[in-house]
């Protein structure tokens, strides 16, 4: 045994020195490293994982290193940087690499990786395997796909380098709203990417995007909605829009984004393209004249802007308040509320479009209502102050949308029976994703509910709203709520997205009614601010912005828990949205 220990000491003197001097950094490289790793079975020596003080570990240029070896995560819990570049890691990567709770930099470039651990990204997804990871370099490998839960595994990722792999698509989860809120640099040049999802607009912090030398044929116009994007590279892609292809080869990022924002993209006929080019030249001349005459450059884009006005609690003589009882903490602790005034749901299919956008948010950002739930109410029917509480299933009664009054326990059981019947009819092994939220309340002694000042339950999350506050075509002012058992920030992110969609719908509705308004034939001017004290002047395009009114959530003693929108909310919206505070 002593002889074996002596042999290890002689083979790995760097480890003995690091242990003796309590080093925080260790670099293993050089000509003798390959033979020693080969003798250790293509893995790092187990003794390396008995140095818990290490913050930085680099093993590079070793053609015999095929796997880090078991014990890395358990033995090096304080590791901040792990650099394993230009080795022979692959074709897979063992799950033992995570979790590493303190890791900030992971460099696996220049290896032979074909896959990452299936189902768990680079570590367990719940909780995140790499919760502090900021930089991930996977360039120069042979990856054909990324794990779907990569964003869950590394939610604080800021830089992702995928250059020089064999990827043909990004996983949709990577661009899910709020999935990677800090990602500022994405490089995936020299791959086989065929399509870029419009959902890339959800990367609110993206500054640099390099997708050169792929197989893209179209660049989504939504890319222009990334508010911080400063540098893009699409060279080496054969785009359908030849003018755009020429632009990406020589124009600045700003010009390309302006072209996308104006609607220029692949797939148009030659005649339409020439007409568009002529129109673009005309607009450029007009902008130049505006600049030379001292007029604002922003005037051209004013008609495309969305306006939101935040009304603070102090400006409202009768603010709505939500009180929270302590019992709800064990069931569904997080709630955010807001009031939106000035919606017009009467024209055409505006109401249906509003409800469809809410359903889409439930499917995407709310993860089929399992992460969070949205409820929208006709403010005229809401009697404040409101109470967010938890009640026994036998005592909680509600008049659900489209149904008769029922106890919560009976309603949930009925919905579960309906879901099971649907499963049998469609011959599925499990209930559809649409109904999975029904099981969130299994085993709960109390159910969450929102109660108005008259004692009526107006919301039973995540199950249903009440018929009492149902949204109708005549609804102008709405009370919005988002609840979650996951996090308060998720509630805020979803509320941001909901209000943005409402602003877009309001703008679209106003544009469709513009001719009637100009001709004076608009019959109903009742959709506005119901409170005469809450007035707002029109914007440059003659349209009034939506008013987003703050709602305070307090405990039973009146101490503030959260207010929305605060000064840190509604700040990651696209550049065409202006928030007046």
UniProtKB/Swiss-Prot annotation:
Q: Which residues cross the membrane?
A: none
Where Phosphoserine occurs, the residues are 314, 430, 519
Family matches, as InterPro entries: B3/B4_tRNA-bd, Leu-rich_rpt, Leu-rich_rpt_4, Leu-rich_rpt_typical-subtyp, LRR_dom_sf, Phe-tRNA-ligase_IIc_bsu, Phe-tRNA_synthase-like_B3/B4
GO molecular function term, any single one: phenylalanine-tRNA ligase activity
What's this protein's name? Leucine-rich repeat-containing protein 47
- Judging by the UniProt lineage, the source's domain of life is Eukaryota
Q: Where are the LRR repeats?
A: 78-97, 102-123, 132-154, 156-177, 182-204, 205-227, 228-248
What ranges does the record give for the region Disordered, renumbered to this chain?
A: 262-301
User: What's in the keyword line of the UniProt record?
Assistant: Coiled coil, Leucine-rich repeat, Phosphoprotein, Repeat
Origin species, per record, is: Mus musculus
**Compositional bias annotation for Basic and acidic residues:** 271-280
Q: Name one GO biological process term.
A: phenylalanyl-tRNA aminoacylation
Q: Which Gene3D superfamilies match?
A: Phenylalanyl-trna Synthetase, Chain B, domain 3 (3.50.40.10), Ribonuclease Inhibitor (3.80.10.10)
Q: Name one Pfam family in it.
A: LRR_8
Which residue stretches, if any, does this entry annotate as coiled coil? 401-436
Q: Is-annotated flag, keyword Ubl conjugation? A: no
């Amino acid at each position: 045994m002593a002889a074996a220990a002596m042999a290890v000491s002689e083979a790995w003197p760097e480890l003995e020195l690091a242990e003796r001097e309590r080093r925080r950094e260790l670099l293993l490289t050089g000509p003798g490293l390959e033979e020693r790793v080969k003798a250790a079975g293509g893995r790092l020596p187990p003794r390396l994982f008995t140095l818990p003080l290490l913050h930085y570990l680099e093993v590079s240029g070793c053609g015999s290193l095929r796997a880090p070896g078991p014990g890395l995560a358990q033995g090096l819990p304080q590791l901040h940087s792990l650099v394993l570049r230009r080795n022979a890691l692959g074709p897979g990567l063992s799950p033992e690499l995570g979790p590493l709770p303190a890791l900030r930099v992971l460099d696996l470039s220049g290896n032979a990786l074909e896959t990452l651990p299936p189902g768990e990204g680079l570590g367990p997804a719940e909780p995140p395997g790499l919760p502090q990871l900021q930089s991930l370099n996977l360039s120069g490998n042979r990856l054909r796909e990324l794990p779907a839960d990569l964003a869950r595994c590394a939610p604080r990722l800021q830089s992702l380098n995928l250059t020089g792999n064999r990827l043909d698509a990004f996983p949709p989860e990577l661009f899910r709203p709020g999935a990677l809120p800090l990602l500022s640099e994405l490089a995936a040049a020299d791959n086989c990417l065929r399509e870029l999802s419009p959902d890339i607009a959800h990367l609110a912090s993206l500054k640099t995007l390099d997708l050169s030398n792929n197989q893209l044929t179209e660049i989504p116009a939504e890319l222009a909605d990334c508010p911080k994007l400063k540098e893009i590279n699409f060279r080496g892609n054969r785009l359908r829009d030849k003018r755009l292809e020429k632009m990406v080869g020589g124009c600045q990022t700003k010009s390309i984004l302006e072209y996308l924002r104006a609607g220029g993209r692949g797939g148009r006929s030659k005649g339409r393209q020439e007409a568009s080019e002529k129109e673009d030249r005309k607009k450029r001349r007009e902008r130049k004249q505006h600049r030379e005459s001292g007029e604002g450059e922003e005037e051209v884009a004013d008609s495309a802007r969305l306006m939101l006005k935040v009304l603070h609690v102090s400006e409202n003589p009768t603010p709505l308040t939500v009180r929270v009882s302590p019992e709800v903490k064990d069931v569904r602790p997080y709630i955010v509320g807001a009031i939106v005034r000035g919606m017009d749901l009467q024209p055409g299919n505006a109401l249906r479009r509003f409800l469809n956008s809410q359903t889409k948010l439930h499917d995407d950002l709310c993860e089929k209502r399992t992460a969070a739930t949205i409820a929208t109410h006709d403010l005229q029917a809401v009697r404040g102050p409101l109470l967010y509480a938890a009640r026994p299933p036998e005592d909680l009664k509600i008049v659900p949308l489209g149904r008769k009054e029922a106890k919560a326990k009976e309603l949930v059981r009925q919905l579960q029976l309906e879901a099971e019947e649907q499963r049998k009819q469609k011959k599925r092994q499990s209930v559809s994703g649409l109904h999975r939220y029904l099981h969130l309340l299994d085993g709960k002694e109390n159910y969450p509910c929102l109660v108005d000042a008259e004692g009526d339950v107006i919301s039973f999350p995540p199950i249903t709203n009440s018929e009492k506050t149902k949204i109708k075509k005549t609804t102008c002012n709405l009370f919005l709520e988002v609840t979650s058992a996951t996090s308060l920030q998720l509630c805020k992110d979803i509320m941001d997205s909901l209000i943005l969609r409402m602003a877009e719908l309001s703008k679209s509705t106003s544009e469709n009614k513009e001719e009637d308004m100009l001709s004076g034939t608009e019959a109903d001017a009742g959709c506005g601010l119901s409170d005469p004290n809450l007035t707002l002047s029109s914007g440059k395009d003659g349209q009034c912005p939506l008013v987003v009114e703050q709602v305070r959530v307090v405990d039973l003693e009146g101490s503030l828990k959260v207010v929305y929108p605060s000064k840190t909310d509604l700040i990651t919206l696209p550049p065409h949205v202006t928030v007046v505070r």
